Regions:
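Glycine-rich loop-to-alpha-helix module at the N-terminal edge of alpha/beta enzyme cores
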Residues: 33-123
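Conserved small-residue-rich beta-alpha loop and adjacent elements
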Residues: 119, 127-196
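Nucleotide-activated donor-binding/catalytic signature segment of Leloir-type glycosyltransferases, i.e.
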Residues: 202-203
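Generic beta-strand/beta-sheet core signal
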Residues: 153, 172, 179-180, 206-208, ...
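Terminal low-complexity tails and localization/encapsulation signals of metabolic enzymes
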Residues: 1-40, 72, 76, 108-112, ...
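A charged, well-structured terminal subsegment
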Residues: 207-229
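Short acidic active-site motifs
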Residues: 102, 138, 212-213
């Protein structure tokens, strides 16, 4: 007996839930061959504002968690992604037109990248923190702390690139709002995040038009950092940088990265602040 095909609905991911855009808008997603794949929600400025509010609400709890605990959560995300390798590989292959073997290699690299960042969670403070030599009877200690809410313009690489911009931001205690270039993989990844131990609001994923959302997030006064990795238009990137200057956001605008290369520590340290404490060494 034939049955009705149940098509997947691709919504937004905000505050741990999957709402539709408040505007009711959607747009068509096609494969590299122009074939219809799905309809995705087109986020509005109101959706972006809701996502920033959710990220801000989640920040105290997430930044207050131990670094070891944050590493455990990232490892759990890797575990859940490992369990859905075949699904992600099939979706990557359909969306990008690559071979199944190449897609599977990309999924495996994304899982490995999560585990790599999870391992750094409780070590980055030892690398970035210092005991400073000072004249006088004092201890002078510097330690890294998360910046706050980071808006991320995701790169075109739908999985490895996406993981590579989200993981370093959240493993150091920040929360984020991500505007994704490839909505289908991004929202499927959101399902993994929602079923892991990651608290709602730590990662918020919006799908839609980058040119519509990026300048508004750059100007938002409750956003503390801005990652422009996925912005290919120089004029749009410049506009975002100018808007971000209003409240002195930390801005990352890298050259085109090689996502298969060793990621290094630069993305983790980019959205960290340094707190220095003076303490008497004797009574």
């Amino acid at each position: 007996m034939s049955r009705l095909s149940v098509r997947k609905t691709y919504k937004l991911y905000v505050g741990g839930a999957f709402p539709r855009s408040e505007s009711g808008r959607s747009y068509t997603v096609t494969s590299d061959k122009g074939e219809f794949l799905a309809n995705a929600s087109r986020a509005s400025r109101k959706d972006a504002r809701d996502a920033v509010s959710a990220a801000r609400k989640a920040f105290p709890g997430w930044s207050g968690a131990t670094a070891y605990n944050r590493g455990q959560v990232l490892y759990r995300v890797a575990e859940m992604l490992e369990a859905r390798r075949a699904e992600f590989a099939a979706q990557l292959s359909d969306e990008l037109g690559t071979s199944r073997k190449s897609a599977m290699e990309s999924v495996d690299a994304a899982i490995d990248r999560l585990v790599w960042y999870a391992g750094w969670s409780d070590k980055i403070s030892a690398v970035r923190g210092t005991a400073n030599p000072v004249a006088g009877p004092y201890f002078n200690l510097s330690s890294p702390e998360p910046t706050g809410v980071v808006a991320i313009m995701a790169p075109a690489d739908p999985l490895l690139g996406l993981i590579s911009v989200i993981a370093p931001v959240i493993v150091t205690g920040n929360t984020c709002v991500v505007v994704c270039a490839s909505p289908l993989i991004a929202i499927t990844l959101a399902e993994v995040l929602a079923t892991s131990d990651l608290p709602g609001g730590v990662v918020n994923i919006l799908t839609g038009h980058q040119a519509e959302l990026a300048p508004w997030l750059a100007a938002h006064m409750d956003v503390n950092g801005l990652d422009l990795t996925g912005v290919a238009d120089p004029a749009l990137a410049l506009t975002c940088e100018q808007e971000a200057a209003e409240n002195l956001k930390r801005v990352l605008r890298p050259s085109t990265p090689d996502w298969t290369a060793d990621p290094g520590l630069s993305r983790m340290t980019r959205f960290l602040e340094t707190k220095t404490v003076w303490h008497p060494s004797s009574a």
